[in-house]
């Protein structure tokens, strides 16, 4: 959450609304689940504790993956640190950027597909909070949790609708329907789930920098959904 203050100041300077948010990697019975937490409280002790535990595990995992990948590709921990900049933690995108800079892959997406994905021999799992616990923690702190790219099955296993029902019961507020990894059929199915469970229908570019194909401004959240998310703040 270190960049939220700077982002808020920049948004104010250019006259646009700013919605603070973080993405939290979680699990459900071995399946990776990503939560978007809008309007998080950076000082709330429960959020701080959850993120600190996850951050430490991510760094340990990144170091082990660098050791594995470095045996076959031009990659060192120092390379990764150069690409992580002032980030609070080190994750797979930083490994991907270092591999691209070394000429091992053309794009970040290529690096993920070949060596960084969950089905890769180089992949190392790491601790992530159980998603239902994470939702309760976020809601208890006043944040607004949204399930990110719930149908992105090209990335690995996805949870079934019954789990989304459990998440909604735990306090989930929104379901990210509009996403580049969702087909039109998936978007329709997810929109129906969101309506049935009274979840806010959202969208997002999932833009994490220039290393991926995602473009700012694609798959946006509607003004009505934005207002519904604002109304859900604790």
Residue ranges and their predicted role:
Residues 88-152:
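Conserved acidic, metal-coordinating active-site core of Asp-based
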Residues 2-42, 51-54, 106, 129, ...:
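Charged catalytic cores and adjacent phosphate/nucleic-acid-binding surfaces used
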Residues 14, 72, 102:
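Phosphate/oxyanion-binding loops and surfaces in catalytic or ligand/nucleic-acid-binding neighborhoods
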Residues 56-83:
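Conserved phosphoryl-transfer catalytic core
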Residues 1, 85-93, 184:
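An alpha-helix initiation/capping motif
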Residues 48-57, 82-86, 121-122:
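Flexible, glycine/proline-enriched loop segments at strand-loop-helix junctions
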């Amino acid at each position: 959450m270190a960049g939220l203050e700077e982002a808020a100041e920049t948004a104010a300077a250019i006259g646009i609304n700013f919605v603070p948010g973080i993405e939290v990697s979680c699990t459900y019975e071995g399946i990776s689940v990503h939560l978007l937490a809008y309007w998080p409280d950076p000082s709330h002790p429960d959020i701080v504790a959850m993120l600190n535990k996850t951050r430490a595990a991510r760094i340990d995992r990144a170091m082990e993956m660098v050791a594995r990948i470095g045996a076959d590709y031009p990659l060192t921990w120092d390379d990764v640190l150069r690409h992580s900049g002032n980030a609070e933690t080190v994750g797979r995108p930083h490994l991907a950027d270092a591999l691209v800079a070394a000429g091992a892959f053309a794009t970040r997406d290529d690096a993920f597909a070949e060596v960084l994905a969950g089905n890769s021999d180089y992949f190392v799992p790491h601790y992530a909070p159980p998603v239902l616990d994470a939702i309760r923690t976020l809601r208890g702190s006043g944040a607004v949790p949204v399930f990110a790219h719930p149908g992105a099955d090209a990335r690995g296993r996805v949870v079934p609708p019954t789990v989304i029902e459990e998440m909604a019961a735990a306090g989930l507020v929104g379901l990210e329907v509009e996403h580049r990894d969702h087909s039109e059929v998936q978007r329709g199915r997810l929109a129906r789930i969101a309506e049935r469970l009274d979840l806010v229908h959202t969208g997002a570019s999932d833009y994490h920098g220039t290393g991926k194909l995602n473009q700012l401004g694609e798959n946006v959240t509607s003004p009505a959904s934005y207002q519904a998310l604002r109304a859900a703040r604790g």
